[in-house]
């Protein structure tokens, strides 16, 4: 009897238990429960970003929120400008354009977040950024003057970018700056913009390579340009026309403002004691500058060479005209004439640029 009982107990260890329907297998004796439950504590009223928006139940606070997005919403939307999806970045820019805040203090964060998108690889994102910048400058006219330095930095980087599509739209951003900024501020970047424009168009600034320049221009249109190169060059020349008109032609609005100031002055010679509009009004007199004749100067030693451009201030109109006449005009006219020979719209835009440069240099010589 004892042997049969032991034999049955041993067989139980190797026998498979038959489970009833709806019942789970019995857990072993050494089973350890590893499941756990977590609890979270949410305190939205103590959030730093939305502390001024939560709990605003008064009528005044509700009216202020209706004029634009709250700080928390705006911060979240600006964080999406770095999203990996191009559609998300474009939708954020469209949202910001339709929900521009009334509070001027918010625009510093907005400009800091959207300006790097000038170098965005997606074309639709850059188009949305153009319309957003135009809307911002129309709503806040003096904002561009505060962020002009960083904006010009990104535009110059786009003009010399390795990706052709980014270079194509770079001058369109510059056109927005030219249309919305004051001339005195954009004039200080005249030399840098002209140098990058030569790089963008594939023109050489070295006078020693002038003999090989015509061959370089003809091969450039065949090898270095893509299928949409002609349309891109037309856009570049149109924007160059506006830039040259802004920086090389006399601003008539300043004369109107001066006439208005003279109408309200007490004495006829009061204008002599008023503050000037230029940053360095006596810079052309060169009172505190010791000049040395450079090798690239003209025959009479009064010309401006490429080495002088690094130390010359371009706030003065006559200085910009002299720089154009001595440095940029000869090579620019030679390259623009190649576009004139092509005819069509690109020939008309090149002719307009030539007329502006010629007129400015003629007036400066007089």
UniProtKB/Swiss-Prot annotation:
SUPFAM superfamilies in UniProt: ARM repeat
Keywords: Nucleus, Ribosome biogenesis, rRNA processing
Biased composition (Polar residues): 27-38
Domain of life (superkingdom): Eukaryota
Chain segments carrying region Disordered: 1-38
Family: Belongs to the IPI1/TEX10 family.
Protein name per the record: Pre-rRNA-processing protein IPI1-1
Record lineage: Eukaryota, Fungi, Dikarya, Ascomycota, Saccharomycotina
């Amino acid at each position: 009897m004892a042997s049969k009982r032991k034999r049955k107990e041993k067989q139980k260890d190797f026998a498979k238990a038959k489970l009833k329907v709806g019942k789970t297998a019995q857990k072993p004796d050494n089973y350890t429960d590893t499941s756990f439950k977590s609890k979270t504590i949410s305190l939205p009223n103590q959030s730093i970003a939305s502390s001024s928006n939560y709990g605003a139940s008064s009528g005044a606070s509700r009216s202020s929120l209706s004029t634009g997005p709250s700080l928390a919403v705006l911060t979240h939307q600006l964080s999406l400008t770095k999203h990996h999806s191009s559609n998300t970045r474009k939708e954020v820019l469209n949202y910001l354009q339709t929900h521009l805040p009334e509070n001027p203090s918010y625009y510093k964060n907005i400009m800091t977040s959207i300006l790097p998108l000038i170098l965005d690889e997606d074309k639709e994102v850059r188009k949305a950024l153009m319309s957003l910048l135009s809307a911002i400058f129309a709503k806040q006219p003096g904002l561009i003057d505060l962020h002009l330095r960083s904006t010009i930095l990104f535009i110059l980087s786009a003009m010399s970018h390795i990706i052709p599509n980014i270079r194509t739209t770079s001058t369109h951003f510059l056109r927005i700056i030219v249309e919305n900024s004051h001339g005195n501020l954009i004039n200080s970047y005249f030399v840098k913009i002209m140098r990058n424009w030569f790089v963008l168009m594939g023109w050489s600034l070295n006078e020693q390579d002038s003999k090989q320049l015509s061959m370089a221009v003809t091969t450039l249109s065949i090898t270095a340009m893509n299928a949409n190169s002609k349309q891109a060059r037309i856009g570049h020349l149109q924007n160059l026309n506006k830039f040259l008109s802004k920086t090389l032609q006399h601003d008539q609005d300043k004369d109107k403002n001066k006439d208005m100031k003279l109408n309200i002055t007490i004495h006829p010679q009061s204008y002599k004691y008023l503050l000037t509009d230029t940053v360095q009004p006596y810079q052309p007199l060169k009172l505190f500058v010791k000049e040395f004749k450079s090798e690239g100067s003209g025959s009479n030693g009064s010309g401006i060479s490429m080495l002088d451009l690094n130390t010359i201030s371009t706030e003065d109109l006559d200085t910009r005209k002299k720089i154009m006449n001595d440095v940029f005009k000869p090579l620019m006219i030679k390259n623009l004439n190649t576009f004139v020979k092509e005819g069509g719209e690109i020939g008309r835009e090149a002719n307009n640029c030539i007329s502006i440069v010629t007129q400015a240099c003629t007036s400066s010589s007089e």
